[in-house]
Curated annotation (Swiss-Prot):
Positions that bind Zn(2+): C59, C62, C78, C81
Essential cofactor(s): Zn(2+)
Protein name per Swiss-Prot or TrEMBL: Acetyl-coenzyme A carboxylase carboxyl transferase subunit beta
Organism: Rhodopirellula baltica (strain DSM 10527 / NCIMB 13988 / SH1)
Biased composition range(s): Low complexity: 18-32
Superkingdom of this protein's organism: Bacteria
Record's catalysed reaction(s): N(6)-carboxybiotinyl-L-lysyl-[protein] + acetyl-CoA = N(6)-biotinyl-L-lysyl-[protein] + malonyl-CoA
Limits of the CoA carboxyltransferase N-terminal domain: 55-312
Pathway: Lipid metabolism; malonyl-CoA biosynthesis; malonyl-CoA from acetyl-CoA: step 1/1
PROSITE patterns reported for this sequence: COA_CT_NTER
Length: 312
């Protein structure tokens, strides 16, 4: 005997009207009699709001979360551990020179690509990218300005532009600045922030700048000039091996990395453990390489005092 296995569809019309289904997902179904008719929850007010960019920053040294404006007011120094953050060349100008006194020199000198050097991209393309990203035409700003009403020749390198490396334009700008200081009997202040040394993209042309700038400094010294060199983090390679180490007075910011090859390179090359704090400002002060460690907030005053003391 054949068995009828059909099951009545609960949604089939009866008497011309659809029957409610317990499995129906229709959104217009009437609410259950006993359920309260609640409004839809307001989820907009409960959304987690992200912290806007540029409000907080993390200290590279102690890891503290810092209010960005407070760090800026302290000249980009951590209020917790005194770590000195990177600052750009233009920020250095604002921190050290009297307001509105900086007169840039030789900004028309621009680097070229005489060797048509290429690594991951061409040197010419790299230069254009760095200029757009940093707003600088090369890794050094040079010019004249006032420090506590004392006129000086002033230069600052910027590690953001190809690690602050010294190419032919950096060397030429520095040489012309030193010659101006010699002619006008100005104190010379160079703040170094160069982790790249001589710029490999220009080959021997960049290495020649070490000798050229050093020779200009020799003539400046012979004329009785006062050169104050300020070393910041990092000052390495050909910059440290030439003009940055030739100051009559050599100041350094706290805990700056200063040397020729970096600690990792030395360890990988000769395979020895380096002394604790090797190549830091504190280590170099202890061993007589620098004259004084100067906190960023005191740098302007220390330079002005040194100029007065030396009669410049």
């Amino acid at each position: 005997m054949e068995m009828d296995t059909a099951v009545e569809n609960p949604a089939v019309e009866k008497n011309g009207q659809p029957t409610p289904s317990s499995t129906s997902t229709a959104t217009d179904a009437a609410p259950t009699p006993n359920a309260p008719n609640r409004p839809a929850p307001n989820t907009a007010g409960n959304r987690k709001r992200g912290v806007p960019e540029g409000v907080w920053r993390k200290c590279d040294s102690c890891g503290a979360s810092l209010f960005y404006k407070e760090v800026q007011q302290r000249l980009n120094v951590c209020p917790q551990c005194d770590h000195h953050f990177y600052v750009s060349a233009w920020e250095r100008v604002a921190q050290v020179l009297d307001d509105g006194t900086f007169e840039p020199m030789n900004e028309h000198l621009r680097p070229t690509d005489p060797l048509e050097f290429r690594d991951r991209r061409s040197y010419a393309e790299r230069l254009v990218g760095e200029q757009k990203r940093t707003g600088l035409t090369d890794a050094v700003l040079t010019g004249t300005g006032m420090i506590r009403a004392r006129r000086v020749a002033f230069a600052v390198t910027d590690s953001a532009f190809i690690m602050g490396s010294m190419g032919s334009v950096v060397g030429e700008r520095l040489t012309r600045l030193i010659e101006r200081a010699t002619e006008q009997n100005l104190a010379l202040i160079i703040i170094s922030a160069s982790g790249g040394g001589a710029r490999m993209h220009e080959g021997i042309l960049s290495l020649m700048q070490m000798a050229k700038v050093s020779a200009a400094l020799s003539r400046y010294h012979a004329a009785g000039g006062l050169f104050i060199s300020v070393l910041t983090n990092p000052t390495m390679g050909g910059v440290a091996a030439s003009f940055a180490s030739l100051g009559d007075l050599v100041f350094a910011e706290p805990k700056a990395l200063i040397g020729f090859a970096g600690p990792r390179t030395i360890k990988a090359t000769i395979g020895i453990e380096l002394p604790e704090g090797f190549q830091t400002s504190e280590f170099l002060l202890e061993h007589g390489y620098i004259d004084r460690i100067v906190h960023r907030k005191s740098l302007k005053t220390e330079i002005a005092t040194a100029i007065d003391y030396c009669g410049k």
